[in-house]
Amino acid sequence: MDTEKLTTMSRDAVTAAVRLALTKGNPTAEPVHLLHAMLMVPESSVAPLLKAVGADAARVDGAASAAIDKLPSSSGSSVAQPQLSGALARVLADAETRADKLGDQFVSTEHLLIALAEVDSDAKNILASNGVTTAALEKAFNDSRGDKRITSAESEGGESALDKYSIDLTQRAKDGKLDPVIGRDSEIRRVAQVLSRRTKNNPVLIGEAGVGKTAVVEGLAQRIVKGDVPDSLKGRRLVSLDLASMVAGAKYRGEFEERLKAVLNEIKSAEGQIITFIDELHTVVGAGASEGSMDASNMLKPLLARGELRLIGATTLDEYREHIEKDPALERRFQQVYVGEPSVEDTVAILRGLRERYEAHHKVRITDSALVAAAQLSHRYITGRQLPDKAIDLVDEAASRLRMEIDSSPEEIDTLRRQVDRLTMEQFAVEKEEDPGSKARLARINSDLADAKEQLRGLEARWAAEKEGLNKVGELKTRIDALRTEADKHTRDGDLAKASEILYGEIPELNKQLDEASAAEEDSQGKSMVSEEVTSDDIAEVVSAWTGVPVGKMLEGESEKLLDMENRIGKRLVGQQAAVKAVSDAVRRSRAGISDPNRPTGSFMFLGPTGVGKTELAKALADFLFDDETAMVRIDMSEYMEKHSVSRLVGAPPGYVGYEEGGQLTEAVRRRPYSVVLLDEIEKAHPDVFNILLQVLDDGRLTDGQGRTVDFRNVILIMTSNLGSQFMADPSMSPEERRNQVMAVVKDHFRPEFLNRLDEIVLFDELSREDLDKIVDISLDKLNRRLAERRISIDVSAAAREWLARTGYDPVYGARPLRRLIQTTVEDQLARAMLAGTISDDQKVSVDMNQAGDGVDVKGEAPVSA
């Protein structure tokens, strides 16, 4: 026979039979080899067909293996490639004849099985002994496949290539397996309009990842099922083509094209009854292409142009530009339908529509405030992703976290279990003692253990009852959802009596049970051990886990912290009350929602002499806002003095070295969008740097070298400068005169459009002698914290503190001389003493004035008491 007429599975079965004969050393491949090989293929339709006629496939396979073992065999290196026996050749010829009579274009494994039952051989005897006859097989085969015919090498047992390489979305909609689609009416209507055209009726959905392109197609499938579509689309099948399955396992050249051609022929022969959907449409360009073969897009073009294939595509803007637009012949066959990101209000509506599905899945209750919080917080805090996808993910993860907490033991039970374990171990240890004290202790332990076990049993019973109540609510919701799907099916089938029975009988009864169970849960919520409600707090915790922003910064506690901002930062930063107040006011305006949400949280320029706390305020601000001092991006602008170095901030342009690395500023903010950005010594930067910063200050965004938009809306931008510091140290000027002089210098150096975009220009005052006293205390506290790891404590006398403040005071250089003084006088002496062994761990150290009164002495005292 012509082996080209065998289906892929039949060809594989014959090849496996020959290989089996070679392995066993048989000179020829017999029908029993083929029978055994067909039963060894997991995807084969042979085993189900045998089952349909009442035979046991495993028993048939065992008999075939036993028959193969009885065949003549030879061993050694001289074993030749087995040939097909005469009986097997007759089986193949008989199968081909049967296929032709049945109108099949290819010979499947079912045809081979029927032929094995017909042609005289050991295989026929095995099948007959198991009650398998040709007539029974033919009847079962025809019943299973109906009017389907094998029209391609990929078809098997009447299974169409389309069913094999696609997912029927309309069937999934009938089965209630698709999530409800809320909104998107205009996009679905536009898709329906394009599909109703005579030619080029192929819409392509274009939009950012996560905006709901696939949901539009699922919405169309649901409308087709309900009949809520134009007449030209009523009763149509909407199938999603699975290109990955089509390419997977295509071993031979032309096999992929053969599979795709079979699918396309089926769609074409359906005469418009099938609408095809390809997600990630750009994958058809180049799919299956190899030397001398045609890719999928070129095979689709003729059908698309003639209107014989109604295809819906979905892809992102970038992929469309990169793949589809490069092929004008393919692009012109599609009509673009843009799918934009929904608003926060629309996202809340979408979440409300999905709530029931997620409640049933996680068996928890999701409050409306949680849905609103998910939409608002994801829009505000999660950048780089689109609504509604990111909001749905928030709700899903928050519900998942709560479900895990419900399934885990509550803290009270965990504590009691550990207590029972500890008392049990103590009981075993004390039981061996015979003295009266131990016996009294044992009695006390036994009493405590009995009480703990009794308490634990009560809590475990209560917890089990609460879990049962929660699970009951979830199960009721799942049953109601399944009944609604069943009612829809009966309505479509015209069985209105059954649909009415479900809608007006079974569902109301279940709803009543659900209300009772929910009411019981709500009554016990105040005293329950586990919560079953997803609230806005849970959503905020997930946002915190994703972005690193502390939860307390987004909920009620934020207002108290913001109102106390000056005092909290003042504990760390001495003096500069005006600077702290200016920064605090700007942050409060932003968090209260009064300032422009499309600009950075705050943008400040700190002016003043060195060592007065400009950088320290930036660190304190990062610690206050983000509970982490390291949440600060520090860039030394003296590194950006040359024109060519400016591009390092946003990344090298395409074609230049370092293009893939991104920019120092943009990458830092992209990875950590909630941070304080400190641009130190801003006056040293090249003027072109300020052109870049204009976009950040005005729009809160910046495009990097790779074309990605980086969001600066949640960044506090701080620039420091020493410009005009000579006037700050002039005692002959009043504060107003000093400010005017400094601002004159600043205006000469920076352009007006740059200065005009800043929230505040803050002038730092010189540190006073009194300020130095406080800084001494702060510096010594830091030293004490560093030494705490070695359990060493330092006690500095008042005289020594006063001397350090007096000697370290320098109005020109600020607080830095004091830091150096503490380093050279206290830390150096301490280090020498520790190395010499005169001061060791767990020891108290005293610091006092020396006898000459021109320095301090560091001495070890008694060990620190435990």
Curated annotation (Swiss-Prot):
Residues 342-548 are annotated as: Linker. It holds the Pfam family AAA_2. Residues 3-147 form the Clp R domain. SUPFAM superfamilies: Double Clp-N motif, P-loop containing nucleoside triphosphate hydrolases. One of its GO terms (biological process) is cellular response to heat. It is found in: Cytoplasm. ATP 2 binds at G608, P609, T610, G611, V612, G613, K614, T615. Residues 515-534 are annotated as: Disordered. Residues 392-526 form a coiled coil. Disulfide bonds: none annotated. Residues 84-147 are annotated as: Repeat 2. GO terms for molecular function: ATP binding; ATP hydrolysis activity. ATP 1 binds at G207, E208, A209, G210, V211, G212, K213, T214. InterPro entries: AAA+_ATPase, ATPase_AAA_core, Chaperonin_ClpB, Clp_ATPase_C, Clp_N_dom_sf, Clp_R_dom, ClpA/B, ClpA/B_CS1. Residues 558-766 are annotated as: NBD2. Residues 160-341 are annotated as: NBD1. Residues 6-71 are annotated as: Repeat 1. GO terms for cellular component: cytoplasm. Keywords: ATP-binding, Chaperone, Coiled coil, Cytoplasm, Nucleotide-binding, Repeat, Stress response. Part of a stress-induced multi-chaperone system, it is involved in the recovery of the cell from heat-induced damage, in cooperation with DnaK, DnaJ and GrpE. Acts before DnaK, in the processing of protein aggregates. Protein binding stimulates the ATPase activity; ATP hydrolysis unfolds the denatured protein aggregates, which probably helps expose new hydrophobic binding sites on the surface of ClpB-bound aggregates, contributing to the solubilization and refolding of denatured protein aggregates by DnaK. Belongs to the ClpA/ClpB family. Homohexamer. The oligomerization is ATP-dependent. This is Chaperone protein ClpB. It comes from Propionibacterium freudenreichii subsp. shermanii (strain ATCC 9614 / DSM 4902 / CIP 103027 / NCIMB 8099 / CIRM-BIA1).
